[in-house]
């Protein structure tokens, strides 16, 4: 790939950028709207500091996938419009024509038009490997009784902790955070390392990534056997504008044709991939996500955020 350019998601640049890029105008199959997708540059909407998904140093898995797509779709380069993934993220990026695709978006969210899903994962339980909790696969396991479990407040697994009688001793971590100044996932894994908590429940991609970054050895167990209750497994798509029908079809073809390569990227970042039967998807070498080494650029990522932000953002966990 050629050099990657960066675009900040500032309001002042919206009109200038919208007027400056060479757009492809394509009639919609229904209605008179046109598509404004840059034919030369893959323009990606991203969070500036939210590993393992993305950061401004372009070390995230979304950015690795973007580079793959740009290469396969013959784009000259990749550019990023950065904005914290919170209320206003879609409006300030994709909706303002600053970028043409959100690489990771939960299936079914009506703020964007979804492509076909390109991976499926779940919330996961993390605990020390070969420790007292070895073999635990569900929140209801008696081994977790009287244990202190870290949980992101307001996420679906909290229902299962309450059902198992574990919520009273649980340590809550914030869901609504500014990803540029706080990191609930890293804090939780750090607390697991110090013994402040005995286990952690996190969104799968975060669980896998931060467990890999940690000095200690951890087991990451996708929560797929919890019984009736809120969904814990979700399909993840790419998000595009409602008017961009041909662009969606282009991305769907790319997902179909390069699914294997996309899987390898996700697994390398620690994402516990699941098929539709909740069975783990392995790498081409037969390894699990936790057995694969992190990409070198991901190992070097600074996951501590600079204290210079004011907006409130949320971890990109699916809403269930």
Each language-model region and where it sits:
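Bacterial N-terminal signal peptides
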Residues: 10-20
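Extended ligand-binding regions for polar small-molecule ligands
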Residues: 26-27, 35, 60-73, 130-133, ...
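Ligand-binding clefts/hinges and TM-proximal coupling segments of bilobed small-molecule sensing domains
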Residues: 26-29, 34, 156-177, 252-320
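Extracytoplasmic small-molecule ligand-binding "clamshell" domains
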Residues: 27-105, 109-110, 179-182, 269
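Periplasmic-binding protein-like
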Residues: 47-48, 120-132, 212-255, 272-296
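Acidic, polar ligand-binding/catalytic clefts
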Residues: 67, 71, 79-143, 154, ...
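Alpha-to-beta junction loops
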Residues: 75-77, 94-104, 147-148, 188, ...
